[in-house]
Amino acid sequence: MKRSILAASLFLIAYGLSLSIPRVQAQPFPNRPIQLIIANVPGAQSDISGRLLAEEMEKILGTKIVVINKPGASGTLGTDAVVRSKKDGYTIGYPSAGGIVYARVLNPEAVPYDPDKDLEPLGLHLFFPNIAAVQAGAPWKNFGELVDYAKKNPGKVRVGTIGQGSIDHFNLEITQTLTGAQFTSVPFKGGESVLTALLGGHIEVAFDVLSKYLPHVNAGKVRILLLTKKKSELPDVPTITELGYKQELPSVWMALFAPAGIPEEAKKVLVTAIEKAAKNPELKVKIENMGNIVDYKSPAELKKIMTEDYERALSIAKKIGLRKP
């Protein structure tokens, strides 16, 4: 009898204690800061646009987003850091097409990840329109005149790009194939080197990113002959398809990724926040004033762009000997 009373008493005490202890429930995502890895140096166009997007996402998510810059190796260092991060949604990346597409086309053994298997696409944010530019005093007033001259004078027109295997190099090769014109490719090491060479008269044409050239266009020093994507500030500058050619030229893009395997809840929250932030009208104006084009694409659309860009670049690389068949 005493044992029964004792057992009952212990049960009641334990039950009472269980009621007094608050139950630990899973908190909704996110409940702590998120890291955003940008695969470029502070102050670069991609860094600025990524930070602006992060600020808007903070308002939507109600949590801090800590930006970490990891530049180097054509964007693959920062991208690899995302791949190797914990698969919990608290580390995401903002790489360019370079680290996702072009680095593995040119030098696949140096890329330690497979974007198709190791990364979860969250959405494409923007495009950096690529251009064909000449000095304002150049004899060619439009792209057609440049092509006609290059056809009549094979190899005489020097075209600068930021290096072999860059998107601009691939655009040059596509342009030659489409038009039948023959240019001389002059690869540089990136940065402002192509623009400097154009202004100095060391090359006749620059295939590069628009944003660097806009101040010189406004100053009357540079003329843009071709865009890979239409820009409202340059309504009279055509894309190559507007000139009747059947294939578009690719543009540099910036997108957001997480490591593959993050929880579905985290993915859903991040994708929704990215889309809402990217489509914010005030943010869009800020970023487009830098010469870029905000054109949000869903994860599925981003996946399609990745595949198409890679297959096209790989085909060209094999054709011109940058990659073994």
What residues fall within each predicted segment?
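Positively charged n-region of N-terminal signal peptides that target proteins for export
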Residues: 1-4
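C-terminal segment of classical bacterial N-terminal signal peptides
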Residues: 13-23
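N-terminal (or domain-start) structured segment
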Residues: 26-118, 156, 164, 177-209, ...
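Hinge/capping helix and adjacent helix->loop/strand transition within the periplasmic-binding protein
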Residues: 57, 81-90, 105-193, 240, ...
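C-terminal lobe and pocket-closing loops
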Residues: 127, 212-279, 308-311
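Mature extracytoplasmic/periplasmic domains
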Residues: 268, 284-304
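Extracellular/periplasmic bilobal clamshell ligand-binding domains
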Residues: 298-324
